[in-house]
Amino acid sequence: MEQSFLPIRCALISVSDKTGIFSLAKNLIKHKVKLITTSGTYKYLLEKGIFSTSVSEYINHPEIINGRVKTLHPKIHGGILSNNKNINENKNLNIKKIDMVITNFYPFKKKVKKENIKIENIIDNIDIGGVALARSAAKNYKYVTVVVNINQYSKLSSEMDKNSGSVSFKTRFYFSTLAFQYSYSYDKEIFNYFNKIYFKEIELKKNLKNKKFPELFSISFSKKEDVLYGENYHQKAAFYTDPVIHPGTVPFSIQRQGKKLSYNNIVDSDIAINCVMNFSEIACVIVKHSTPCGVSSGKNIIDAYRSAYYSDPDSAFGGIISFNRPLTIEAAEFIINKQFVEIIIAPVIEKDALLTLKSKSKIIVLECGYLSKNFLLNFKKVNCGLLLQDSDNKILKEKDIKIVSKRQPSKLEIESSIFIWKIIKFIKSNAIIYGKNKRTLGIGSGQTSRIFSTRIAAYKAIDQGFSLKGSVMASDAFFPFRDSIDFASKFGVSCIIQPGGSINDDKIISAVDENNMSMIFTNTRQFSH
């Protein structure tokens, strides 16, 4: 039966992060605890006037392989794993009972975050001995106290002071749980590194090409920060990030000013960055409630912003504005004089622009960098499961399209069609976009009927005073019936871009021809659920 309170007589200390260890060691000595320490910890404490027994002295064997093997020894693990049943065995082998293990591991995660670091340096930061110590001690929680979290040092000291140098069973069990969690997270970080970085996703690319996904999929994220609340005020939330962070993403972004990002801010900013980075030409995207409400290209970012804003100024109020070019002082002044804005995002924020924005200190300003890579995987959590798919990174080019109508679209119609097609995958299905001259005129999203999205997008455009004559229309999926074609024709739409693939394609094409319109097939559906 476990001891309710365990007197601590001997503690093994092996820590990479030595924060707080001096104060804890002093408290242990106050309670007459014998200290056994590994070389780095031994030297650190000795310099501060605390004497201990080195592991090498205790086991009568030097550290070997440049310190890679220090504590992997029967006298260490025999002392940690022993219980009341094997006291005599340990006594005959001159193995002392170790009542406490204080350890933390090599800083693997910090090394991984550094760019261009060699694999050899990463390997040297994979802890073996510390992990073994923590697991041995956690396994034997009935007879050993294990501490892996520097934030628990004060709790440990307080408990020992209160209980004359002893630790309660409840605390030992809690600390063992933390140790297993720490070890688990550490191993996942290592796995993710080898899976994502060392193999540089070659195997993943090959497997995805062959439509193969791993039998076991494991992910590990680290908490960056708590956010004020979740999607709604009554929900709690936190923001976690990938072990490796790339430019052109929200986690990579530097917040130059403004209040703390909310849950919804992060979601909307991610969509805004992803959408605007699809374009090689100068572009601006305005997002509201996870949906682009205005997107435009232009000869400069002010021109692009102006057109995006006037696509739907009502929805743009309090929205997220994202650019794929540096934010200039002229653009910053134009925006703050035009509308109330929640967030402004650009790959670079020029100094003068930031000085101008400081007059509106509540505006969140994110400098996100330029997108450096396409991400291979996309996943969505469902209750008790995870859906995994390869990311939709396909960018439509003119050589990929198929013109299926009698009327041939003009060069400008093709360019505008491809432009709005790049946006459609960021609009919730059923999605319809009207556009012209590389800008959106009206967006219909999230309707369970395609004809309703077609109508909503048109009414939005008309409400802003736009004429749809000579405009283009994009649909994220095929048209099951001709009703949307006939509706668009009434407003003068001249070209439609859609995936095709309906059993009624022939009827749809006939409707297009009857209305003297052009139709482009992309052969790629762009659902967003």
Curated annotation (Swiss-Prot):
Signal peptide: none annotated. InterPro entries: AICAR_Tfase_dup_dom_sf (IPR024051), Cytidine_deaminase-like (IPR016193), MGS-like_dom (IPR011607), MGS-like_dom_sf (IPR036914), PurH-like (IPR002695). Residues 1-148 form the MGS-like domain. Its EC number is 2.1.2.3, 3.5.4.10. It comes from the Bacteria. Pathway: Purine metabolism; IMP biosynthesis via de novo pathway; 5-formamido-1-(5-phospho-D-ribosyl)imidazole-4-carboxamide from 5-amino-1-(5-phospho-D-ribosyl)imidazole-4-carboxamide (10-formyl THF route): step 1/1; Purine metabolism; IMP biosynthesis via de novo pathway; IMP from 5-formamido-1-(5-phospho-D-ribosyl)imidazole-4-carboxamide: step 1/1. It catalyses: (6R)-10-formyltetrahydrofolate + 5-amino-1-(5-phospho-beta-D-ribosyl)imidazole-4-carboxamide = 5-formamido-1-(5-phospho-D-ribosyl)imidazole-4-carboxamide + (6S)-5,6,7,8-tetrahydrofolate; IMP + H2O = 5-formamido-1-(5-phospho-D-ribosyl)imidazole-4-carboxamide. Keywords: Hydrolase, Multifunctional enzyme, Purine biosynthesis, Transferase. One of its GO terms (biological process) is 'de novo' IMP biosynthetic process. GO terms for cellular component: cytosol. One of its GO terms (molecular function) is IMP cyclohydrolase activity. Belongs to the PurH family. PANTHER family: BIFUNCTIONAL PURINE BIOSYNTHESIS PROTEIN ATIC, BIFUNCTIONAL PURINE BIOSYNTHESIS PROTEIN PURH. The IMP cyclohydrolase activity resides in the N-terminal region. This is Bifunctional purine biosynthesis protein PurH.
